């Protein structure tokens, strides 16, 4: 007997539906005899397996500690791989500054705020080097990742904006603290500059590194070329660092310049470290703590906003 292909397909479809109904009936009758607690457990396990397989679901708690630490460790290893540039170079630059000022000014330079000029100069050079290195760490990392096109390797992992900022800032703080320790040891050995209030030194070095690390993130995100990043560093960061009382006391400035200096957060970072190292300063360290802390909050807020929205990162 000749059977059409359409009739064969209809027969196969009817048989498939019949088998499916029978299988479902067996499954329902089999599960019906199970206790209610077992049924609830099976349903809960099925729900968990479904949720665990969904894309984009965080499965490691409220904070991705492992991811944050991994990003921070990557930033630390990045500058430690070139330790001759990140550790030795700042020490040599600080030594050159002290040597040049010693030769150029000589012993005829009087005391500044009751201490020898070289002793007064050491905390300023230490702090200036710290803030420059903290800025360079985050800015160069983000800018190079954007320009080379591998920023996606940082944005793709399940890290929130807060975790990304903490990871990058942690690397900047580590670099700033390492540079501070190296220069402080050199100052103690060659100039005899000790620590009058070590806690203040630690506080302002950490706050200065956080502030400059955040500014470095902003610069790295904003810059699309290394030329733009260099312009930000040369025309904004370096002048603010040099005009913040690094080499002088602001008491020698005209009143107008003193007012401008007091509006500069970098001044309070340098002044706070100077107070902690040699016990003299142009302003109260408590005022500096408030100003630098407020500046850190503002800068970190901008970093979080840009990381959360992907400004100039995802476009």
Residue spans for each PLM region:
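Compositionally biased, low-complexity segments
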Residues: 2, 19, 33-36
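Histidine (H) residue identity feature
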Residues: 2-5, 262
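Basic polycationic patches enriched in arginine
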Residues: 4, 9-10, 14-18, 29
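Hydrophobic transmembrane alpha-helices and immediately adjacent juxtamembrane helices
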Residues: 16, 35-198, 203-315
